[in-house]
């Protein structure tokens, strides 16, 4: 496997720092320890403790938040990374693959990507995501604005983004921005958060590891079959496009390819949440362990002694009877289920990484590590199917998701007057911190966080010298991003309380 040299991928350069060099192993390790400190101490990580995993607004601390889920993903990611490196050592490939000074960074990058992987998710999880997209899609009408010429079906409600006769280049930009704003995605928001909002100045390698999908949010062309998995969701926004281009150059990544260690982070997430969602459902009394076993065995089909289901799920269930009366049988069942599952799936993920190393290294491997015809992947899929059928469709979960959708939609309605302001008026409001003719908008602006307001101001300053028509389009884009940034950064409880306060429901 010539051409595989991880020194080409594990870059310790940072976007806001001068180029640096680190020769010995400890110096290189220190660079990535700095990344760890920046990430662990960031407000985005702390906010995960009050963001939904499955059950919004949950008061039972035993039920997972995004933070506790991310800690579990971090542990599994570390395990997979160690398994891969151990196999490289056994095959005497460490030096051949350029890893002799990069063993600790290899693990650290994976661990921190696992910890960060959900930081871009809005309140109320995927329903919060859907609320943002639906709200902006209704106003942007992205499909009505495809192409470079106006269409009679165009229903865009934003004057500056409507397509105009004879303005081909501006219309292409308008269409791109309408698509971009209608494609809010947690993974893309994570890239924006660490680079544009928090300015953590992480190494390119560390950020590359959370670039899970490789399609820009504004993409409207057909997706090439060679990358239909890697491009199935937006991975970054137009606002971060230049940064992502820098990142790709620094990490030697082709346009739609992935960073190799991202596959490990993705596998760790798949392994962790498939068990966690079921355990939380038992904690919430949605079903019992016995009912869960029945659901899983029905999905598996005929169980034979010694097959993977019997070794993993059956063995954990048999342990249930032995522990009865001595300790919490439910806790013991899930401990054994987790140990058995991780013990089978982690080596399988590591083996898949190694078997497909050339494509994984280049980033063109167009599937997840845990996506094949093996029994291990079948087991993972039955966990997911049981969760979809019996957890996500449960009335309590659906009721909370509907509430979350309404909260996020309502907050967007409340803050929409800021988007309706003329560009000159909003610019004056930002500069003076008040506008006499817009008292409601002034008070809404004051509620936005300083961090998000500064990010908007910096973006507006960068585009200041553009021709006026382009400036107005980009200014609206960054203003809409400002509102998305603020609302998506809320915790579940803060969003719920803010909605009630502003609706005078208290």
UniProtKB/Swiss-Prot annotation:
| Gene from which this protein is expressed | dgt
Name its co-factor(s): Mg(2+)
List the source organism. Answer: Yersinia pseudotuberculosis serotype O:1b (strain IP 31758)
Q: What is this protein called?
A: Deoxyguanosinetriphosphate triphosphohydrolase
What SMART domains does the record point to? Answer: HDc
Domain called HD: residue spans: 66-274
Biological process terms in GO annotation: dGTP catabolic process
E.C. number = 3.1.5.1
What does the function comment of this entry state? dGTPase preferentially hydrolyzes dGTP over the other canonical NTPs.
Oligomeric form and interacting partners: Homotetramer.
Query: Does Cytoplasm show up as a keyword for this record?
Result: no
MF terms from GO for this chain are: dGTPase activity; magnesium ion binding
Please state which protein family the record places this protein in: Belongs to the dGTPase family. Type 1 subfamily.
Q: Which UniProt keywords apply?
A: Hydrolase, Magnesium
Q: Which InterPro entries match?
A: dGTP_triP_hydro_central_sf, dGTPase, dGTPase-like, dNTPase_1, HD/PDEase_dom, HD_domain, PHydrolase_assoc_dom
Question: HAMAP family attached here?
Answer: dGTPase_type1
User: Could you tell me what reaction this enzyme catalyses?
Assistant: dGTP + H2O = 2'-deoxyguanosine + triphosphate + H(+)
For the keyword Hydrolase, the answer is yes
